[in-house]
């Protein structure tokens, strides 16, 4: 049987890099991982509550965390950075204070930076959010998948694959539907493939969305 490996972990050190960069003693390792999860969840929740564009996409491409003894540096890569436009400094300060309360940062400075992504629809996270928004609005899954593939092709990718699993269109039996356009060489380690696994809650139940994008 074919064994499926995570495309990002498979390419670490060649075309992919770690999202979190820090060193820790074995006793503190789990605490640092939990802290990273809290940071990511806090950012996503804040953006969900405060910033939403019309299509329902939050627009977070990637969140990178770098830690030192006295500093936590968080870099948010956004496709549609509403944070950058309206009251940037005020909203970033609000997000920082929210995060500091949750993390109990003692003797450590928290610094948040927002970077605009050049081609938003080259990021699988943003594509998955777009499909999730369409499915929540009861758009046909085929239409949502085709539209997502159109958007990635316009962004200049070499290939894209989208998969949706679950009770699609409210059918009683769960199934898996997928579509591929262009090349997606999953076995080639030097191929730059971005991957995302996203969960969306609809009125019929939970659907899983997976997106593979071959950029170069």
Swiss-Prot record:
Record GO biological process: translation
Gene Ontology CC: one annotated term: chloroplast
Intrachain disulfide bonds: none
Intracellular or extracellular location(s): Plastid, Chloroplast
Keyword Signal: no
One example GO MF annotation: rRNA binding
Transmembrane segments: none
Subunit structure comment from the entry: Part of the 30S ribosomal subunit.
NCBIfam families assigned to the protein according to its UniProt record, in alphabetical order: rpsC_bact (TIGR01009)
HAMAP family documented for this protein: Ribosomal_uS3_B
Family the entry assigns: Belongs to the universal ribosomal protein uS3 family.
Protein name, entry field: Small ribosomal subunit protein uS3c
């Amino acid at each position: 049987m074919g064994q499926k490996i995570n495309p990002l972990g498979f390419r670490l050190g060649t075309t992919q890099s770690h999202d979190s960069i820090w060193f820790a003693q074995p006793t503190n390792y789990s605490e640092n991982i939990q802290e990273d999860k809290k940071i990511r969840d806090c950012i996503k929740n804040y953006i969900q509550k405060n910033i939403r564009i019309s299509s329902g996409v939050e627009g977070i491409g990637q969140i990178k965390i770098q830690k030192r003894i006295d500093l936590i540096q968080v870099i948010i890569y956004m496709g549609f950075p509403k944070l950058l436009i309206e009251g940037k400094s005020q909203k970033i300060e609000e997000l920082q204070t929210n995060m500091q309360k949750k993390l109990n940062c003692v003797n450590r400075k928290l610094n948040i930076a927002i970077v605009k992504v050049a081609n938003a629809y080259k990021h699988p996270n943003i594509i998955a959010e777009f499909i999730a928004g369409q499915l929540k609005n009861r758009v046909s899954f085929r239409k949502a998948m085709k539209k997502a593939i159109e958007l990635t092709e316009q962004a200049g990718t070499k290939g894209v694959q989208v998969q949706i699993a679950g009770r699609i269109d409210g059918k009683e039996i769960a199934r898996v539907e997928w579509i591929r356009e262009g090349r997606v060489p999953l076995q080639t380690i030097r191929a730059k493939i971005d991957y995302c696994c996203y969960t969306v809650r609809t009125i019929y139940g939970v659907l899983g969305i997976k997106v593979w994008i071959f950029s170069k």
